[in-house]
């Protein structure tokens, strides 16, 4: 059995589930017990037209009774929407559960007055009076690793719930609720109700009378109780309550309140309670004004000494409205008075009700520690003694004494000091069982009270799934790191560079060209490469129309300057001189004669004749090649042969062109035939290029 109690032993998966179920039902059952004693159930007083505020009419009848922790409270339960935060399976992120019991004043009419022990309570612009506040929390900083037997934990919780059941029935708020339920007027103007709050958020007293505000001149108007915590291997279950000690509220009409004071002169004891100077109240109006003016403190302000004592009480009055105008905590005198009040230990002092406040002065001077203070201030005092300071972002959870420096609308309640302790961020304790439990339940590393409003307790799971999705996808390649984008343009550039080097070498073999030719050659490289590709790919389409596939540029149509740009196309023939191609010298000579500025009519006629003979020879060659039974002859070869003959004949005709006879003809026909001569020369040049490239294509 000793091995079971070793701290090093971890919880199994089944044990973790059982422990989580126990802790979750602890929150739900505690809320059910408190509501059972604070809210009137439908079977008791609720009618179809009744309105009981927050939770009075929101109970639902369940199919089965909740018998957790050996306590059966009937088949009425709190709606699931009210406890949705505490029904979460992740128990490590459960926020503190706060149950607030309040007196609803919304039903009070203008001719009704709320009274507490025959004292009129000012309820203007107030709709609620907080009666008590319960705090249920799961503290991860306190644990016991040796408590590994869950039946023992369950039995301890049963004892705690019996104590809670007994305590909830003994508090003053339950007596008030029981009195209102048993009263003859079921439709009373006031009723007790309860609400559920998230303890991780600030609790303000805007529009209501908070728990820290006094309604009578009592030494202590609030008290607190704490039940023994239940230790588990991963944390401690705690229950505490802060409540008003006097809840004798009742509703009276304004006329009844005045008529009941006509016999005050015959009651000296009552008269001295309200008239400390011995002066009798002759009229009910004087009595009413005196009661209203001294509702919080029954002291007269006729003597200066009494006025000074009144100011002292107001200075240390917890949650006082008049104390909100005190200087800020940066003042030296205020800090001294606050520190002397908060760091001292309470000394019980009994103040008797007398008709004079002179005896209060030495008591207040000697024993300022006897003034009533709230639970939150006591918790803050303990934190100051241990050297801990509340962070600046937790000032909204300061004690009720700190409400002196705030407005009435932002004044917090007296239980905020406990919420500071519960919600202060602390480092995760060195608890191996807690770490094992967190890993099994996949809970986050921090509780939900430390997360922001936009945070999710399943954020880690979403992040893991996102990372797995990224790992399953292949790596992305960015364009800046990939050289494949530039492969095609680089290959084209290298091809153009090779052709440029080839043409440059060819021109150097024939001699250095002039600057004008170099410029024209550089401008026509792109068009020549495109012409060469189209010639190789479309052989048959050129037979019908020679000039359709080779569209000359705007520079090639000009005579003289544009003629040399065709030279690289013509000089391809020098690589195939053995196959019958025209020689370079004859072609160069022809181009030199042809590039002269004037063009004669004889040259034009010669060009026309050569084209006709070229066409007829091509047709005869095609006919003979079709009828022959031997190997078909390539028509391009025949076309090239006839073209060579025409070129030599036209060259001879040009030598005869220098005679006087031809000169006269030239002078007569220059004008009308100049336009036709340019077109014929262009056709001839393209025909020559066609023949030369076709020959090269055949050799390839």
UniProtKB/Swiss-Prot annotation:
Positions of region (ATG1-binding): 428-487
Composition bias type Low complexity, residue spans: 332-344, 595-631
Annotated Basic and acidic residues bias: 656-667
Coarse class of the protein's main subcellular location: cytoplasm
Region of interest: Disordered: 319-352, 506-562, 576-637, 649-700
GO cellular component, one term: phagophore assembly site
Cell location: Cytoplasm; Preautophagosomal structure
Composition-biased stretches (Polar residues): 506-532
Role, per record: Activates the ATG1 kinase in a nutritional condition dependent manner through the TOR pathway, leading to autophagy. Involved in ATG9 and ATG23 cycling through the pre-autophagosomal structure. Also involved in cytoplasm to vacuole transport (Cvt) and more specifically in Cvt vesicle formation. Seems to play a role in the switching machinery regulating the conversion between the Cvt pathway and autophagy. Finally, ATG13 is also required for glycogen storage during stationary phase.
Quaternary structure annotation from Swiss-Prot or TrEMBL: Hypophosphorylated form interacts with ATG1 to form the ATG1-ATG13 kinase complex. The ATG1-ATG13 complex interacts with the ATG17-ATG29-ATG31 complex through direct interaction with ATG17. Interacts with VAC8.
Protein name: Autophagy-related protein 13
Organism for this UniProt entry: Ogataea parapolymorpha (strain ATCC 26012 / BCRC 20466 / JCM 22074 / NRRL Y-7560 / DL-1)
Gene it is expressed from: ATG13
């Amino acid at each position: 059995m000793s091995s079971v109690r070793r701290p090093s032993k971890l919880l199994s998966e089944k044990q973790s589930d059982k422990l989580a179920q126990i802790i979750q039902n602890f929150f739900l059952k505690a809320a059910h017990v408190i509501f059972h004693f604070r809210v009137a159930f439908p079977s008791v007083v609720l009618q179809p037209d009744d309105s009981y505020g927050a939770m009075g009419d929101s109970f639902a009848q369940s199919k089965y009774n909740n018998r957790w922790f050996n306590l059966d409270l009937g088949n009425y339960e709190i709606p699931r929407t009210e406890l949705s935060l505490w029904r979460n399976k992740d128990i490590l992120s459960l926020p503190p559960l706060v149950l607030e019991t309040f007196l609803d004043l919304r039903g009070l009419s203008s001719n009704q007055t709320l009274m507490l022990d025959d004292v009129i309570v000012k309820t203007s612009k107030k709709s609620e009076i907080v009666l008590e506040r319960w705090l249920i929390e799961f503290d991860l900083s306190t644990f016991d690793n040796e408590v590994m037997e869950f039946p023992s934990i369950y039995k301890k919780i049963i004892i705690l719930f019996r104590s809670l059941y007994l305590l909830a029935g003994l508090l003053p708020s339950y007596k008030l609720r029981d009195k209102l339920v048993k009263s003859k007027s079921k439709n009373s103007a006031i009723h007790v109700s309860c609400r559920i709050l998230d303890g991780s958020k600030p609790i303000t007293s805007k529009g209501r009378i908070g728990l820290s505000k006094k309604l009578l001149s009592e030494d202590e108007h609030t008290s607190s109780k704490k039940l023994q915590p239940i230790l588990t291997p991963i944390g401690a279950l705690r229950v505490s309550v802060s409540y008003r000690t006097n809840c004798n509220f009742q509703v009276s009409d304004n006329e009844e309140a005045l008529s009941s004071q006509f016999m005050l002169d015959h009651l000296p004891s009552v008269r001295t309670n309200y008239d400390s100077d011995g002066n009798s109240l002759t009229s009910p109006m004087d009595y009413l004004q005196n009661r209203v003016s001294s509702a919080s403190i029954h002291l007269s302000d006729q003597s200066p000494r009494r006025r000074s004592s009144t100011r002292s009480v107001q200075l240390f009055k917890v949650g006082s409205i008049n104390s909100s105008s005190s200087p800020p905590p940066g003042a030296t005198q205020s800090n001294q008075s606050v520190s002397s009040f908060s760091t001292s230990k309470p000394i019980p002092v009994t103040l008797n009700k007398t008709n004079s406040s002179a005896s209060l002065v030495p008591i207040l001077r000697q024993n300022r520690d006897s003034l009533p203070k709230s639970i939150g201030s006591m918790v803050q005092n303990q934190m100051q003694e241990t050297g801990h300071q509340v962070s600046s972002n937790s000032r909204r959870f300061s004690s009720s004494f700190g409400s002196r420096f705030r407005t009435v609308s932002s004044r917090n309640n007296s239980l905020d000091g406990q919420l500071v302790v519960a919600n202060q961020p602390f480092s995760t304790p060195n608890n191996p069982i807690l770490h094992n439990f967190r890993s099994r339940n996949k809970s986050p590393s921090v509780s939900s009270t430390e997360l922001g409003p936009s945070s999710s307790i399943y954020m880690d799971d979403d992040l893991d799934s996102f990372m797995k999705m990224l790992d399953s996808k292949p790596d992305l390649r960015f364009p800046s790191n990939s050289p494949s984008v530039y492969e095609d343009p680089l290959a084209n550039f290298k091809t153009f560079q090779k052709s440029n080097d080839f043409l440059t070498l060819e021109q150097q073999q024939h001699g250095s060209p002039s600057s004008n030719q170099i410029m024209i050659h550089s401008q026509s490289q792109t068009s020549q490469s495109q012409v060469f590709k189209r010639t190789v790919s479309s052989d048959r389409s050129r037979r019908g129309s020679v000039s359709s596939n080779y569209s000359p540029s705007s520079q090639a149509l000009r005579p003289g300057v544009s003629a040399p740009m065709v030279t690289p196309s013509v000089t391809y023939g020098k690589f195939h001189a053995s196959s019958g191609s025209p020689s370079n010298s004859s072609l160069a000579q022809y181009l030199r004669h042809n590039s002269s500025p004037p063009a004669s009519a004889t040259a034009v006629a010669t060009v026309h004749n050569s084209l006709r003979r070229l066409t007829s020879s091509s047709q005869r060659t095609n006919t003979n090649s079709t009828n022959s039974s031997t190997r078909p002859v390539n028509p391009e070869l025949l076309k090239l042969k006839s073209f060579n003959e025409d070129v030599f004949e036209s060259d001879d005709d040009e030598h005869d062109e220098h005679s006087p006879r031809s000169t006269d003809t030239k002078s007569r026909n220059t004008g009308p035939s100049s336009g036709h001569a340019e077109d014929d020369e262009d056709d001839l040049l393209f025909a020559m290029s066609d023949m030369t490239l076709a020959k090269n294509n055949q050799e390839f």
